[in-house]
């Protein structure tokens, strides 16, 4: 079902797909089983060095830790600045997606990525573990680190670009659209 305009491909037999939500939950469960204390809904307000590591302050209290991993995504620069002089600033990139109905799932059997551009990793058409297709993302710099809304222009770009790879996609079989931010 690939476009006849496709001239070459890179076959990566080790590539795979996962359910990203279940994968993230499994990683959190594994971390807890190995002694990690999750402090959910606890924004970090200060970080200080201590003889044993670090003290992380939140509205819910202070937490002592030997190690602190800054996994704050697009807010990682703000968390970094709580401990060190600001050294960088993150401008998030919004990526918009289509989640297609299972009726479109047979269009591709592998992850189809286009070549990346200067602005992003490229638009993909990929099967999901549930038999659907996921299509996207675009890459649009946004100033607001909470802006995960979709736009008509962004989704039109994703649709047009994906059709260059898989021209038989029926975007009327779209279940939902969503967006995320990348650092």
Locate predicted features.
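Core beta-strand elements of the Rossmann-like FAD/NAD(P) dinucleotide-binding domain
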Residues: 58-67
């Amino acid at each position: 079902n690939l476009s006849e305009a496709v001239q070459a491909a890179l076959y990566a037999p080790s590539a795979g797909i996962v359910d990203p939500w279940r994968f993230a939950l499994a990683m959190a469960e594994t971390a807890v089983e190995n002694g990690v204390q999750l402090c959910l809904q606890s924004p970090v307000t200060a970080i200080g060095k201590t003889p044993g590591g670090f003290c992380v302050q939140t509205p819910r209290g202070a937490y002592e830790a030997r190690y602190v991993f800054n996994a704050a995504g697009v807010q990682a620069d703000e968390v970094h600045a709580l401990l060190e002089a600001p050294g960088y600033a993150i401008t998030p990139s919004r990526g918009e997606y289509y989640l297609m109905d299972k009726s479109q799932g047979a269009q591709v059997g592998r992850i189809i990525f286009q070549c990346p551009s200067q602005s992003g990793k490229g638009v993909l058409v990929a099967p999901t573990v549930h038999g659907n297709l996921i299509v996207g993302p675009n890459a649009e710099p946004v100033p607001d680190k909470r802006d995960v809304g979709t736009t008509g222009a962004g989704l039109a770009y994703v649709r047009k670009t994906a059709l260059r790879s898989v021209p038989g996609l029926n975007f009327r079989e779209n279940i939902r659209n969503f967006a995320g931010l990348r650092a």
